[in-house]
Amino acid sequence: LTPTDATEVGLEDYRGYAEHKPMPGEPEPDPERLAKRANDVLTHLNFGKSDEPLVVKVAISGTGVDGALKNLEADTNGWDFDNVVQQNRVAWENILGEFELEGGNKADKTMFYTSLYRTFVAPFLYQDVDGKYRGMDGKVHQAEDGLVNYSVYSMWDTFRAAHPLKTIIDKDRAIEHARDLLNKYQTGGVLPKWELHSDYTGEMVGHPAVSVIADIMVKHPEAFTAAEFDLALKAADETVNFNLDKTESWVPYQDAWNGDKRFTVMTRHNDYQEDVGFIPANTKWAPDSGDKPGYVEGLKVDKYDELVNESVSYGLENAYYDWCIAQIAKLAGNDQQYDRYMARSESFKNYFDYNPEQYGKLQDTKGNALGATGFMRPAYMNSGSKVWANNLKAECLDENMALSIPDGMDYNACKDRKALNESDVFWPYRAEHRGEDFTEGNTWQWTWFAPHNLNGLANVMGGERIDRTDFSLPEDVTEQGKAAFLANLNALFNADSNADTSQSHDMSGYIGQFVMGNEPDHHVPYLYNWTAEPWKTQEIVDQAMNEFYHPTHEGLIGNEDVGQMSAWYVMSALGFYQVTPGEASYTIGRPLFDKAVIPVADGKFTITSENNSQESIYVKSVTINGKQLSDNFSFAHSDLKDGGELHFVMTSDKSEAMKAL
């Protein structure tokens, strides 16, 4: 190119980049930091007019221009564009070709392989050819001892199915991810929860990295050293417990919108959960009512309490993450930390409001009682005591708790909270995106997030809470708990899908109040395997696969979320799912294909289905390597990691479906 062939311009020609508009509820960005961004320079290249194709190679690096040049020089793909496309196609065929399918229709197979492809896209390699990478401290490091640096960990989404799937079909990479996350702790100081290009971001809820690490460690402990178990426990312990001094001057904890990322990366939620047993919903409100007129019972201590919000979602997820840390502590042989975090993991019980008289008023669209016994619910701390928090004015509901807004009012007036419990009813349909009591949903969806202790969840649903001190055995479930668990599941899937007109845009793909289009509910269809009616898991999973997944431009429900939505489909189509990441076991669903062969750690695992069809959705019998499955239709990771066979016999007759094991 000659000097006249290219023109460099400033970012002012791309003004929209600097004019960041915050989402509803998001704080306004700092003007000075945005001004700095606007002064950054991009390069605009004008190649003039030509009838010939222009072939350009672009190299990127997280370390700088020199790194990008080295990466470009190391490229051996050549300059034939069509040939490079073919090389890419062959590379993907080599990966996807490891998976063999028989049966099913063309659309099912297209959907399966497309979904499988999406699960392999991220996290992706984020280091130069010479091993240099940018760490979480903003500095350039040299990868040693086989370390591989990855980026794009959307872990609040992907800990649920995408990462567990990798432990099955791509074990070595799953191990690399765990080691990479531990290295990010070492270069940054805490584990990330949504890492992007060596930046913490602080996006979403809780501390999902501990789930990702625990899951691969419990499945393949032989791959890790005692020192790595100790490091994982240290990283988890320091990450989930707020430390005001730890991040005082850290570069990675500064950004344009939040300034100090202690607001979102290392929050104070767990301090309250451990001290008082739950996260008060009024933590962020100042006692002097300075920031929210009327909130005279606010608890706010300092600015770091401002984002102690979404108390129920944080409380439930943190209880599960504490359980994950306990599993790491067990591997590390640290009994004290195991007992501490197992005790903390029981705190989900403090959010459940058992009130069958009140919630028994809820009805389906035909006027039938739903049978709900209670919900996970926010609570205030008022004069040292826990008080349930309300979210709607009673005058906006009828006698069956259905929305009935009086003339002269609108929905916003019904839900406005200008004083502690000015609202006088807790309405389970009220949905929220962010910033209130729940994250991207309502209590219908969030009530089910206690995957680490489903028996304990069933017991509180039955009004029989059991406070444990001995964690050597799982909690026993009572008969009343079993009945209530089933009743509440049925209520979820039969509730009105359109009850709340303020639903978050992340809420889509409704079956009752179950939401397939967002992550918190992804395990819920499989919970019928813990009831006397396990065939309902097969019905719901089949319905979700057929209604919400299609190989078309608009065929995927919700947000793909870096492979999680697709990973749910892949595992469900194979016929099994992991309800509790961190526990090396799986439960069954409804297999979509007559035969599927997938790569596993040390061989091939085969799923076969006799009498399989679109109508034969019920499981008549099932074995793993010729043996009957365990309770709740489960089998262990050890049953598949060396290869083997999961064999189904299907039927279209619901009366022939297997009963509870």
Give residue spans per PLM region.
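Extracytoplasmic low-complexity repetitive segments enriched in small/polar residues
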Residues: 60-63, 593, 614-616, 628, ...
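Beta-strand-rich binding/interaction modules
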Residues: 617-621
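Acidic/polar, glycine-enriched structural segments that form the non-catalytic walls/loops
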Residues: 1-149, 226, 230-241, 651-661
